[in-house]
Amino acid sequence: GFMDLIKKAGGWLKKKGPALIKAALQE
């Protein structure tokens, strides 16, 4: 349910977060 979505979002952010931050800083 809802908690599963939060867990998935958290896992995705852990994977993608650093790359997104790097991309944002480089702009």
UniProtKB/Swiss-Prot annotation:
GO CC annotation terms, alphabetical: extracellular region
User: Where does the record place it?
Assistant: Secreted
Summarize tissue expression: Expressed by the venom gland.
Q: List the disulfide bonds.
A: none
Q: Which GO terms describe its molecular function?
A: toxin activity
Note whether Secreted occurs among the keywords: yes
Where, by residue number, does the polypeptide cross the bilayer?
A: none
Q: Which UniProt keywords apply?
A: Antibiotic, Antimicrobial, Fungicide, Secreted, Toxin
Which GO BP terms, alphabetically?
A: defense response to bacterium; defense response to fungus; killing of cells of another organism
- List the Pfam families: Ponericin
Question: What does the function comment of this entry state?
Answer: Shows a broad spectrum of activity against both Gram-positive and Gram-negative bacteria. Also has antimicrobial activity against S.cerevisiae. Has insecticidal and non-hemolytic activity.
Similarity field: Belongs to the ponericin-G family.
Query: What name goes with this protein?
Result: U1-poneritoxin-Na3b
Q: Which organism is it from?
A: Neoponera apicalis (Ant)
